[in-house]
Amino acid sequence: MGSKMAILILGLLAMLLLITSEVAARNLKEAGEAVQETNEVADAKLVAAGEAVQETNEVADTKLVGAGEAVQETNEVADTKLVGAGGVVKQRNKVGYGKLVGVGGYDYGNWNGGQRSPYGTGAICMRGCCFPSSLGGSVSCCPHEWQ
């Protein structure tokens, strides 16, 4: 009777072990599917984030292009202003000692007026600020000389 009881207990333990292993396998399979679903969601989010980053970069690139154009326009305006300001040397900006002051033109420091440029020919500028020619003469006086 003791051996029958031992066989019965061993059989029950074997069945219990079989059921436990099947439940564990099913749980493992479900956990694997859950992990796979999580990865699919994460991948979808990463793809969406990648597209959002790409769109953000496209917007940023557009803004940079726009900013570059604005900078270019500003430089064109600045260049235009510099071109328009060429040769203007205001009396109040003079430093003296014949130094070049302002944008363009040559100031020879003739503060008393009526002096010919050091080139000796061409225009006689009241304050000595003129534009020299390539031949050595004075082409014209600076605009503030006309006032």
From Swiss-Prot:
Protein's UniProt keywords contain Membrane: yes
Location of this chain's protein in the cell: Symbiosome, Peribacteroid membrane
Keywords: Membrane, Nodulation, Repeat, Signal
Annotated Gene Ontology cellular component terms: peribacteroid membrane
Sequence repeats: from-to residues: 31-48, 49-66, 67-84, 85-92
Keyword Protease set for record: no
Any coiled-coil regions, as ranges: none
Induction section of the entry: During nodulation in legume roots after Rhizobium infection.
Domain of life where this protein originates: Eukaryota
InterPro entries: GRP
Signal peptide (from-to): 1-25
Family, per entry: Belongs to the GRP family.
Stated name of the protein: Nodulin-24
Organism: Glycine max (Soybean)
